[in-house]
Swiss-Prot record:
Stated name of the protein: Tegument protein UL43
Species of origin: Human cytomegalovirus (strain AD169) (HHV-5)
Pfam families with a match to the protein in the record: US22
Biased composition (Polar residues): 1-12
InterPro entries: US22-like
Key words, A-Z: Virion, Virion tegument
C-alpha cells in the first residue's frame, strides 16, 4: 500500500537529524556543489539551512591552528612590529645623519689642512722665509697633519727653537753643519707614529727653496725627503726617508722570487759565495717603486779579478767584499739607465758600483733592506752627515754626499766656475 506524501515526510523527519534536512541551501558534503532533487511543493516542513551550514563551518574552522590569543592580540602584535620597524628606521636615519655630519666635518678639516699646507709652502719660498716660517709655526703650534705613508704617521707643528728639542745640537747653525750653501735651515715640527712606544719623534726641517729634511739622531744626519716643498712632503710622506723605508717597506718579486729569497736568507759571505756558484746566470726581477728591475746572478769569484777590488775595500771601509749580481737598466739619472753591480761586505752592508766612475756607493744595511729601499741612496744626493761638505775626509767615500741639495744652483759650484766674476 502506497504511503501518502505526508507519511513519507514524517518517516523521513523521524529518521534523519533535524539540522540535516536536505534543502536547496543545505547540501551535504558529498554532493560537491550539486544540489539534490527538490521535494514536491506540497511538503510544508523545511528547516532553515543556516543551522547545519553554520555547524559545518564551525567544524571546518576547528581544524585551523590559531595562535594563542584573540584576533585583537594579533593586531596589537602587528602594531608592535610596525613600531619596532619605525624605531629601527629612525636609528638608521640618525646613523646616516651622523655619518654625513662626520664626512662634512672631515671635508672641512681636509680643506683647512690643505690651506695650512699651502700657506706653509708659500712662507718657505718667500724672500724672508725664515721669519715667515717662524711666525707661522708659533701660530699653529700643536696642529697635526696626516701623512700618506706610512699609515698611522703624523706631522705635528712644533716650535723646536723654544722647547730646545735637539739638546746638544746647535739649532741656529744647522745649515752650516750639515748643508753646503743654504742660507737657513729651520725646524718646523716633528713626525711620529700614532701611539708609538719607545720611538722618539723625528724633527722636520725646511731649508732654502722649500726643501724638506728629516733629522736622524741615530746616525746624526739629515735626509732630504722632498725637493718639491712642503706640499710634496705631505703627499708623499716619508717614502724618501731611507731608514724608515728600509724598515717598513715591502719586497715585490716579479719573476724568480725563489732565487731572490735565497739571497735574502744568506747569513754571511761564505753562504753568499756558495749561492752565487750555485745560481750563476740565474735571472730574477723585482720592483723598485714603479720600475721592474732585472737582476743577473754573477760568479762571486770574479770579484777578486776586478782591478777596482782594492778601491772598493778602501771606499767601503771593509775587510772583504763580494760581487753577487748585476742589476740591468737602472733609471738612476735623467734620460739614462745604468747596469749597476751589487757588492756585499763582511757585515752584510750592500753597495752599488757606478759603471762609469767605478766608485762604490752605500745602498742598504742588508739584502732584505736593499730589495725594500732599492737605489734611493745611490750616488747619495739625499743623506748629509755632519761636516760632510766642510770636512769631506771625515766621511768614508761610499757614504759621502756627492752633491749639494741645490744641485746646479750650488753657490760654491757657481763661484768655482767663475759665474759670479765681474765682466
Amino acid at each position: 500500500m502506497e504511503k501518502t506524501p505526508a507519511e513519507t515526510t514524517a518517516v523521513s523527519a523521524g529518521n534523519v537529524p533535524r539540522d540535516s534536512i536536505p534543502c536547496i541551501t543545505n547540501v551535504s558534503a558529498d554532493t560537491r556543489g550539486r544540489t539534490r532533487p527538490s521535494r514536491p511543493a506540497t511538503v510544508p516542513q523545511r528547516r532553515p539551512a543556516r543551522i547545519g551550514h553554520f555547524r559545518r563551518r564551525s567544524a571546518s574552522l576547528s581544524f585551523l591552528d590559531w595562535p594563542d590569543g584573540s584576533v585583537t592580540e594579533g593586531v596589537r602584535t602587528t602594531s608592535a612590529s610596525v613600531a619596532a620597524s619605525a624605531a629601527r628606521f629612525d636609528e638608521i636615519r640618525r646613523r646616516r645623519q651622523s655619518i654625513n655630519d662626520e664626512m662634512k666635518e672631515r671635508t672641512l678639516e681636509d680643506a683647512l689642512a690643505v690651506e695650512l699646507v699651502n700657506e706653509t709652502f708659500r712662507c718657505s719660498v718667500t724672500s724672508d722665509a725664515r721669519k715667515d716660517l717662524q711666525k707661522l709655526v708659533r701660530r699653529v703650534s700643536g696642529t697635526v697633519l696626516r701623512l700618506s705613508w706610512p699609515n698611522g704617521w703624523f706631522f705635528t707643528y712644533c716650535d723646536l727653537l723654544r722647547v730646545g728639542y735637539f739638546g746638544h745640537l746647535n739649532i741656529k747653525g744647522l745649515e752650516k753643519t750639515f748643508l753646503c750653501c743654504d742660507k737657513f735651515l729651520l725646524p718646523v715640527g716633528t713626525v711620529s707614529r700614532c701611539e708609538a712606544i719607545g720611538r722618539p719623534p723625528l724633527p722636520v726641517l725646511i731649508g732654502e727653496g722649500g726643501r724638506v729634511y728629516v733629522y736622524s739622531p741615530v746616525v746624526e744626519s739629515l735626509y732630504l725627503v722632498s725637493r718639491s716643498g712642503f706640499r710634496g712632503f705631505v703627499q708623499e710622506g716619508l717614502r724618501n726617508y731611507a731608514p724608515l723605508r728600509e724598515e717598513l717597506g715591502y719586497v715585490r718579486f716579479e719573476t724568480g722570487g725563489d732565487v731572490g729569497r735565497e739571497f735574502m736568507l744568506a747569513r754571511d759571505l761564505l753562504a753568499l759565495w756558495r749561492l752565487c756558484m750555485k745560481r750563476e746566470g740565474s735571472i730574477f726581477s723585482w720592483r723598485d717603486g714603479n720600475e721592474a728591475l732585472t737582476t743577473v746572478v754573477l760568479n762571486g769569484s770574479q770579484t777578486y779579478e776586478d782591478p777596482a777590488h782594492g778601491n772598493w775595500l778602501k771606499e767601503t771601509c771593509s775587510l772583504n767584499v763580494l760581487q753577487v749580481f748585476v742589476v740591468r737598466a737602472v733609471p738612476v739619472e735623467s734620460q739614462q739607465r745604468l747596469d749597476i753591480s751589487i757588492l756585499v761586505n763582511e757585515s752584510g752592508a750592500v753597495f752599488g758600483v757606478h759603471p762609469e766612475t767605478r766608485q762604490a756607493h752605500f745602498l742598504a744595511r742588508g739584502l732584505l733592506g736593499f730589495f725594500r729601499v732599492g737605489f734611493l741612496r745611490f750616488c747619495n744626493n739625499y743623506c748629509f752627515a755632519r761636516d760632510c761638505f766642510t770636512h769631506p775626509e771625515s766621511v768614508a767615500p761610499a757614504y759621502r754626499a756627492t752633491g749639494c741639495p741645490r744641485e746646479l744652483f750650488c753657490r760654491r759650484l757657481r763661484k768655482k766656475k767663475g759665474l759670479f766674476a765681474r765682466r
